[in-house]
């Protein structure tokens, strides 16, 4: 089976292709011009070189099988692998963006886009609040399959080449359980799609022994920790992984995470009615994160089929956030996007193409 050209970093292609400058030319065609056929690159390459590329590599290995659009402008994409027909999902989040014109001080309104990518088909972690785990674990995604999610979404929405995307590894799967492919994808996002690592967030459920490995890669990405509870009993009931990597174990590794000035580790905290949304929980969270440059992102539980949990009131979420902010711990409430199309946090899973989606 031919390798996908999207699986190669710029350095790898530079070593593989002769002369080496061909790699940069090829990257331009792939990531700046969205070319999906080697024959479309004839302006730069000889017929012999194109024949070599066609013999050794393939291009697209996934395709968009279905799209659902939310009333808020967000879109959920169902992708199908062209190799094994398995499916996985990614989400395009559309948000308003305001910038200050440095010359006139005028407020400029625009739009910013975030692509929530998947790194696995299914997930092994088994969080009880997450819909992804109901489908079981199928396989890891290759770097090429991760990259193509953002590439195809950008192309489908006619976003200008120069339009920067934010990338969040918060779709299906645990990024640290597919670390090599995730790290390669980050490098290609940067050198290929020109997405700064500062715009890329890797979210983990807390695979503590792999956090220092990720740190050692020096990728410059943002780290997010899915915490969701303030004591081990509650967290273990929500996230079985906590029995292996408890809260103290995870936080010990987070304290070693290299942070640039003015940067913080993000802690994601899923608020579930009458389970972890009390003011007492907020007080314990404040104590847990003492000494860590952190930001708390509160997420109101997003209901899904078969779930036993309930979504808390916005009022209780605001009380939780107000307490933390008043004590000096930066806390925001994540606006739940795409709830109407089941594309919010914890609602993604593999779907069979023949079922209603």
Swiss-Prot record:
Xref: PROSITE patterns: RADICAL_SAM (PS51918)
Biological process terms in GO annotation: rRNA base methylation; tRNA methylation
Enzyme class: transferase
Record bears the keyword Cytoplasm: yes
Radical SAM core domain sequence ranges: 109-340
Active-site annotation: 89 (proton acceptor), 345 (s-methylcysteine intermediate)
Residues bound to [4Fe-4S] cluster: 123, 127, 130
Cysteine disulfide partners in this protein: 116-345
Gene3D superfamilies: 1.10.150.530, Aldolase class I (3.20.20.70)
Coiled-coil annotated spans: none
The organism's place on the tree of life at top rank: Bacteria
Principal place of residence: cytoplasm
Catalytic function, reaction form: adenosine(2503) in 23S rRNA + 2 reduced [2Fe-2S]-[ferredoxin] + 2 S-adenosyl-L-methionine = 2-methyladenosine(2503) in 23S rRNA + 5'-deoxyadenosine + L-methionine + 2 oxidized [2Fe-2S]-[ferredoxin] + S-adenosyl-L-homocysteine; adenosine(37) in tRNA + 2 reduced [2Fe-2S]-[ferredoxin] + 2 S-adenosyl-L-methionine = 2-methyladenosine(37) in tRNA + 5'-deoxyadenosine + L-methionine + 2 oxidized [2Fe-2S]-[ferredoxin] + S-adenosyl-L-homocysteine
Family: Belongs to the radical SAM superfamily. RlmN family.
Protein's recorded name: Dual-specificity RNA methyltransferase RlmN
